[in-house]
Design a protein with these regions (language model features):
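Short "domain-exit" segments at the C-terminal end of structured domains
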Residues: 236-240
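Small-residue (G/A/S/T)-rich helix-start motifs and N-terminal tracts that mark the onset
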Residues: 1-81, 90-106, 111-235
Length: 240
């Protein structure tokens, strides 16, 4: 609903049947699993198929293990646009110099994941989110950082854009996964990675805003609300 063209999910074989009947709107790339998670065969499978796709998103539903580290490193060594979320952010820290790649990488951490990625203590990030986001974006100029907190900080090459659209409903588990998906869709439609990140965070926050009751709000409501948005054109957002 956010405008993505075609989508392929690379998943452990043990959950492929469930996903196959859940929706008709994506394709599946099955990988042998081990104890319910990716086996080491996932590394070769990604290598063999990565050139079939323009954007690679990694992290959602994965775990902190060596397979995740290897998959993230392989993706970052490619010439593809990459979106990192969840445990892929932890994995990226293991070889963080790869974030200095020439192609776009968009990272979507919440505060704890930002701590995993950078090694900066959670309390420091909470007290100085603007500065932490700005400094990170200066050190990794090809990256666009979307730092999620009560406010959202979108940082690129030392410029920070602040989305002040607080919504308690977005603290619910799964909301960040939906943002990651919208980011992927926008990255496929916008030539500029910063514009993609700005549009995605706006769509995400405004879709959630249509549900006033944060107590009954569910993350899938964001998806259902996207067609109901009356979007404004974001041409030159205000920098801070």
């Amino acid at each position: 609903k956010s405008g993505i063209g075609t989508l392929t999910l690379m998943v452990p074989e043990c959950i492929s049947n469930v996903l196959a009947i859940k929706s008709d709107f994506y394709m599946l790339l099955q990988c042998a699993d081990r104890n319910g998670i990716f086996s080491s065969k996932a590394i070769d499978l990604l290598k063999q198929n990565i050139n079939n796709y323009s954007i690679i998103s990694i992290g959602n539903g994965m775990q902190k293990n060596n397979i995740t580290i290897a998959l993230v490193e392989q993706a970052l060594k490619s010439d593809k646009k990459i979106v990192l979320d969840a445990d892929a952010l932890w994995a990226a820290q293991k070889n963080i110099e790869l974030l200095k790649r020439s192609e776009t990488t968009i990272l979507t951490p919440h505060i704890k994941e930002m701590s995993d990625l950078t090694g900066i203590h959670v309390s420091t990030i909470l007290s100085n989110p603007f500065e932490v986001a700005r400094d990170f974006s200066k050190e990794y100029p090809s990256c666009v950082l979307i730092l999620k907190s009560s406010q959202t900080y979108i940082a690129h090459q030392g410029n920070v854009y602040v989305l002040d659209a607080q919504n308690a409903g977005l603290a619910k588990g799964g909301s960040g996964d939906i943002l990651c998906g919208i980011v992927v869709a926008m990255l496929g439609q916008c030539k500029d990675s910063l514009q993609a990140a700005l549009c995605a965070t706006y769509i995400h926050s405004q879709s959630a805003k249509l549900d006033i009751d944060s107590a009954s709000f569910m993350p899938e409501d964001i998806i259902n609300n996207i067609p109901n948005l009356s979007l404004i054109h974001i041409s030159e957002p205000t920098r801070q």
